[in-house]
């Protein structure tokens, strides 16, 4: 069965867990300012074909959903989601 209530209910993909264990002891200056985030920004720019694009990382799904919804939807538009979807259950009133 597929569950859409929250991504916190599932474990991560084995490849992600493996990579996290490889870099677990690396020291980084802070979220968004390290070499891994800089590499990710460049990959996102390349995938979008926008080498000069500004790329920002947000710390959570609620903040990310709020930014995207505010940016893309007009005041009279809404989000269609599964009744058990995170945006419908855990973010009600937050966005």
Language model regions located:
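Buried hydrophobic packing segments
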Residues: 64-72
């Amino acid at each position: 069965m597929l569950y859409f209530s929250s991504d916190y209910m599932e474990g991560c993909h084995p490849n992600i867990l493996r990579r996290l264990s490889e870099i677990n002891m690396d020291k980084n200056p802070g979220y968004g300012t390290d070499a891994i985030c800089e590499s990710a920004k460049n990959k996102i720019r390349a995938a979008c074909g926008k080498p000069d694009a500004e790329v920002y990382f947000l710390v959570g799904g609620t903040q990310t959903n709020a930014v995207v919804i505010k940016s893309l939807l007009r005041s009279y538009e809404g989000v269609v989601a599964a009744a058990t979807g995170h945006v419908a259950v855990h973010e009600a009133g937050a966005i």
